[in-house]
Swiss-Prot record:
Protein name: Protein phosphatase PP2A regulatory subunit A
Classification of source organism: Eukaryota, Fungi, Dikarya, Ascomycota, Saccharomycotina
Short name of any one Pfam family annotated for the protein: PPP2R1A-like_HEAT
Family the entry assigns: Belongs to the phosphatase 2A regulatory subunit A family.
Any one cellular-component term (Gene Ontology): cytosol
Subunit (UniProt): PP2A exists in several trimeric forms, all of which consist of a core composed of a catalytic subunit associated with a 65 kDa regulatory subunit (PR65) (subunit A). The core complex associates with a third, variable subunit (subunit B), which confers distinct properties to the holoenzyme.
Gene name as annotated: TPD3
Amino acid sequence: MSGARSTTAGAVPSAATTSTTSTTSNSKDSDSNESLYPLALLMDELKHDDIANRVEAMKKLDTIALALGPERTRNELIPFLTEVAQDDEDEVFAVLAEQLGKFVPYIGGPQYATILLPVLEILASAEETLVREKAVDSLNNVAQELSQEQLFSDFVPLIEHLATADWFSSKVSACGLFKSVIVRIKDDSLRKNILALYLQLAQDDTPMVKRAVGKNLPILIDLLTQNLGLSTDEDWDYISNIFQKIINDNQDSVKFLAVDCLISILKFFNAKGDESHTQDLLNSAVKLIGDEAWRVRYMAADRFSDLASQFSSNQAYIDELVQPFLNLCEDNEGDVREAVAKQVSGFAKFLNDPSIILNKILPAVQNLSMDESETVRSALASKITNIVLLLNKDQVINNFLPILLNMLRDEFPDVRLNIIASLKVVNDVIGIELLSDSLLPAITELAKDVNWRVRMAIIEYIPILAEQLGMQFFDQQLSDLCLSWLWDTVYSIREAAVNNLKRLTEIFGSDWCRDEIISRLLKFDLQLLENFVSRFTILSALTTLVPVVSLDVVTEQLLPFISHLADDGVPNIRFNVAKSYAVIVKVLIKDEAKYDALIKNTILPSLQTLCQDEDVDVKYFAKKSLAECQELLKN
């Protein structure tokens, strides 16, 4: 599709020509030139050697169309764009395809929408995947604007042209357009013809076309599910044949798409209350789960809970899925085990018999928790704790807790992090006491991990844990740890630790913050405060806490400490004090009557002093904060 840019359409003068009018030209010629200008300008820009310029020009199509008006857009711009669509680079085509999907208002409304179809059909046949995808999206957008008559007279023939073209690219695009017509066709014979055409595509020789068929089939089935009274048995004969083509294809890149197709088919029959096909569909599910191609097994594993949910009305069907599920847990491909590890709790909830969970599922979980692949163990850790909701307290303590505690000691940090992040449900069932002995060492070890990103991750989990574990446990076991992060060697960790204190205050309240955090920060060793970084960190922490503590705490504890740093020897400290003052005034102004004197007699004079500072940065931030404070007082 790409190539040298065309210099045809020479009948329209260039921008340079149209922008210059002879002094001898009459008014009529001048008006004519001005009316040609937008299109001529676009043409000039689309002849530019630099592709970036041509792409930018194409992004302005809507502006050009507005300038031209609907009639000239239809008669001049669209024919010109049809030429461009056959003679430029893929980057330009992609923008053109996307723009045309929003073009119906610019050509005069839906009654003229079919004029956009030929150029989009050209783009939908492009070699470049991105161009085709943009064109298909735009065609589907335009189709929504079409009347029934336009749909039948123009859009359906367009699908037929693409579906019967010689090139696979056109056929792939055709597959993405059926969704715009499948439920708008009320005539059974016409819909049958459409499905027959889709079946024809499913029998194509090229895997690319068959993949497009498999990818789009669930969308078509879901549309029929939303319109249950529309489809006939004959429609489903076609759909069944298409599904069989996909599930029996010899290419795993086609066959794995059968999993989503099967789920959609099951949803349709479940919505209809029709169980006559369920056993056959279960057989198809088992076939896919045990397929020799690992990609097919992976897809079945990844969708296992969704698949199982479609059989949940009959426990006998669920029971038939237990062994295939266990086989996936022992699959020789790590990616398959990783996918199914995330599905354990989701599948187990469909098992009515706790003994199956205890005797079959938990042993599989035990094996997965010790899997040689750390990504499998991490995947299991991210989802497994919900299984406790299916067991009583004694069963959790005796059968599941040992697995969980072992995972809290896993050598891979992500496993421990994922378990810690999802402990609330376990805590709700068995209480924190049984977890604490293993939980605290895991948290402490993660908090000291040499990888700062691991330390960052555990900091981000702390507020979640705080909500789960409660204030008393937190104060006894974790508050020291939270303060210790303020002195980390990595700035990002110190910053995260400061924000962490704010989130904890939002959970536990201002009084807790005053007693457990602020009082300890203000009692730090004077020798420690000789370090600039320590002073800066405490200043940053106290400033961050200003919006989440009571005004009394702000005025009695935070403000005095911050103010005494106003004459600090380090300019960086002084200008951060200036910024802190603005934060403090912003909260004190909520009770201006009470704190007006404090603001005017303490904060503003200090800011005015800082405005005279010898350091330019201090002066800049002091003046900025002073202006903010004065504006707050004025309002």
